[in-house]
Amino acid sequence: MGPVELLHMSVFSQSFSPCGRYLAAGNNYGEIAVFSLSAALSPDASERSQKPILNFTAHDGPVFSLLSTESHLLSAGNGEISAWSWAELIKKSTKAAWTRKPNYETSLEIPEINAMIINPKDNNLIVGGGDNNIHIMDMETGTFKSVLKGHTDYIHCLSFKEREGEILSGGEDGAVRIWDSRTNRPVHCIEVFKYEECARPQFGKWISCLATDSDWMLCGGGPSLSLWHLRSMSPTSVFPLSGCQREAVSYQDLIMSVGEGPYVSHCLHGGTVKAQIPCSPSSLNTLALNLKNTEHRVMTVGGSSHQIDVFTNFSYRALSLSF
């Protein structure tokens, strides 16, 4: 890859291996790079250990979503999902285990897939993207068995509430929709942009990030990043972050968020911004926490750069991996 391509590279997605020792990242050129965290974090790490052990073209279009199961890395490109065995990737083999396409309404349509999550209760893969619908695939058989319709524009993000078995979806239409995964029926619809404390009409109404656990939901995008109590369906905290947020996670007593601007924002649940930690890319698309492996417990962020920043404690950048 030449200097011009590197200059215009964006990292859209990342996922840690089941063992927590490797990181996969997807970019706008359809490539997936696999990095060895154990090599990059070792005391005798060199510049070479910050480069991928493997880099391959997985899709024609950008890799907007990556997701790891117990054995495979799932990647989503334009209209298709591919699975790669982690054991084979580590051996530098890049043959896809399988590729599947959701049942789109027209054969001319090749919508991008923006988000994938697993429903651990029934081992279903939940997929959302450019056709405004949620597609559900049985991971055992590889068949798409249901479609959830309700969004009027494309879906950016998905989350799963395990206790209630509920799917949450956020879209360009400004709605967060909550679905019962047992019946595939809609349960609630929250139009975040209609709440005065969250609305930012100058940025639009789209919802680009979503995270949830039992009673709480984090969401943001055009509207301000906000924390919602799902029993009362009301925002309890609105975070005064200037740009649009693209990914947010809750970890212990912190909310960590990335979006426009070269930093990771650390927020407290009450609504205050505690710190903003500088990063290499000028804006960020993806933030991931590696909690599977205590030895390699890191936060990684990627965005409008060929570099992925690695934080060993979440308050400063330890190193940067690069495509």
UniProtKB/Swiss-Prot annotation:
Pfam families: WD40 (PF00400)
Role according to the record: Component of the THO subcomplex of the TREX complex which is thought to couple mRNA transcription, processing and nuclear export, and which specifically associates with spliced mRNA and not with unspliced pre-mRNA. Plays a key structural role in the oligomerization of the THO-DDX39B complex.
PANTHER family (UniProt xref): THO COMPLEX SUBUNIT 6 HOMOLOG
WD repeats: 6-45, 58-96, 108-147, 150-189, 200-238, 279-321
Keywords, ordered alphabetically: Apoptosis, Developmental protein, mRNA processing, mRNA splicing, mRNA transport, Nucleus, Repeat, RNA-binding, Transport, WD repeat
GO cellular component, one term: nuclear speck
Organismal lineage: Eukaryota, Metazoa, Chordata, Craniata, Vertebrata
Keyword Nucleotide-binding: no
Subunit structure: Component of the THO subcomplex, which is composed of thoc1, thoc2, thoc3, thoc5, thoc6 and thoc7. Component of the transcription/export (TREX) complex at least composed of alyref/thoc4, ddx39b, sarnp/cip29, chtop and the THO subcomplex.
Keyword check for Protein biosynthesis: no
InterPro entries per UniProt: THOC6 (IPR042626), WD40/YVTN_repeat-like_dom_sf (IPR015943), WD40_repeat_CS (IPR019775), WD40_repeat_dom_sf (IPR036322), WD40_rpt (IPR001680)
Protein name (Swiss-Prot/TrEMBL): THO complex subunit 6 homolog
Family affiliation: Belongs to the WD repeat THOC6 family.
Gene3D superfamilies xrefs: YVTN repeat-like/Quinoprotein amine dehydrogenase
GO MF term set: RNA binding
GO biological process: apoptotic process; mRNA export from nucleus; mRNA processing; RNA splicing
Source organism of the structure: Danio rerio (Zebrafish)
Subcellular location: Nucleus; Nucleus speckle
